[in-house]
Amino acid sequence: MRYDTYGDSAPIKKTGAGYDVPEGVDIRGRYDGEFAKILTRDALQFVADLQREFRNRIRYAIECRKEAKSRYNAGALPGFEHPATKYIREGEWTCAPVPPAVADRKVEITGPVERKMIINALNSGAKVFMADFEDALSPSWENLMRGQVNLRDAVNGTISFHDKARNRVYKLNDQIAKLFVRPRGWHLPEAHILIDGEPATGCLVDFGLYFYHNYAAFRRNQGAGYGPFFYLPKMEHSREAKIWNCVFEKAEKMAGIERGSIRATVLIETLPAVFQMNEILYELRDHSVGLNCGRWDYIFSYVKTFQAHPDRPLPDRVQVGMTQHFMKSYSDLLVWTCHRRGVHAMGGMAAQIPIRDDPAANKAALELVRKDKLREVKAGHDGTWAAHPGLIPACMEVFANNMGNTPHQIQAMKREDAANITEEDLIQRPRGVRTLEGLRLNTRVGIQYLAAWLTGTGSVPLYNLMEDAATAEISRVQNWQWLKYGVELDGDGLGVKVTFDLLGRVVEDEMARIEREVGKEKFKKGMYKEACKMFVRQCAAPTLDDFLTLDAYNNIVIHYPKGSSRL
């Protein structure tokens, strides 16, 4: 495909990295022949067009986030406070009908855009695979570009992987899951691609390259005339959804496909966004296929939103489940809102990993998954997330047994009772205890996750759970909150206050434990010490950084030719 408007007249510039690029685009990532098939001149022109058209609106949206943060830090509370959009909240309107290809989304599997993962996930028996450029991926140049190559091969049906260690070749089955792609959030830059001298917006790179190369094959092979399909993360306001809607419309126009072809599910994973669900769906009404409970990031956002409110300390994060009043209210309101507007209400993640060496523990873990999924389906959710193929049969069984033969519950479960959920319901303080073990677990998991992320892995199995960046974020902000306000511990640490000294002792103990668990050799070779410094610096910062990954990103940026400055 080629832009008629650009043709062959657009100036070609060869950068030091060896890629042919249009005017104003500079690539600082390593040259690779396979990457060059993705980073074509026309594809880069499309990304540059998106960047130039939307960069000022993106900047404004990020500034608005900062203003909202200042208001919350001054004591304001988030709420349904927008009189200008009252007509949207109270009006009777629906989103465009759900495409038949994705009517049934009972179980969705998620994972990074790695080659073997993509094949296994598409073959897993799940209805949908969400391929992730966001929290499950460390956004190194190699990971991002290989991910684009892998997705192109997956959409074309040609993807295969030879596992030399097992001498096994992985290929796609005849029946595969529908593919959704999650680009990065608005706040993350792509430092390896400069447009007019500035780093590109990460999500526009992820979306633009994937859409440009795959929309035609996707609509033919996967979407039955619709698509491509996306998941959109980390939004805090409907103005951000409006930008995405405009991006989709521009992409559809460029490709010459009908308006409303592209479809997206928005993750409601920030506290401000829960008060904007109607508005978010309204902005995307021609392109929406629902909302999803991104519950781990939602808890992280709760702490971040109330960072200047010492009266809202979170209990141990393991106690902040969906039965907490503010979490249940969020889930119920999401179901009611989605079904009222005619779209899917997706449940949250089951992060458990099968425990192969302990059948009793494995059985108990699966029972927890079943219980959680039963709660979701009875609450009216149309589907759910799983992090591991081994969980899919259990999740599918629970949803299928409780939904009859219907693909979803959009008409069957209106949840009118949730219409009365108040602002107070959505921000009610969570109940529970704060323990020394909670502080230890946060520290142990946060450091290990960050060490993996710095060495290129964004989806990390830890203590029988598949963890992504959301877990590290909760761990970090909770430690920060407890330290900032000198929280008094319960349980074993009864009466002990969280101080710099206590955190220092905990870090020392947990680093020794990590070394014992992973072994001296791996500990020495890994980036545990660097991760520890970064994690402790974040926990002890006088003001809370918005995102751990934003702070850590410069550590994985490698500019070519070597010696180019980092951001």
Curated annotation (Swiss-Prot):
SUPFAM superfamilies: Malate synthase G. It comes from the Eukaryota. Its EC number is 2.3.3.9. GO terms for molecular function: malate synthase activity. It holds the Pfam family MS_C. Pathway: Carbohydrate metabolism; glyoxylate cycle; (S)-malate from isocitrate: step 2/2. The active site is at R182, D468. It catalyses: glyoxylate + acetyl-CoA + H2O = (S)-malate + CoA + H(+). A motif (Microbody targeting signal) lies at residues 565-567. NCBIfam families: malate_syn_A. This is Malate synthase, glyoxysomal. The lineage of its organism: Eukaryota, Viridiplantae, Streptophyta, Embryophyta, Tracheophyta.
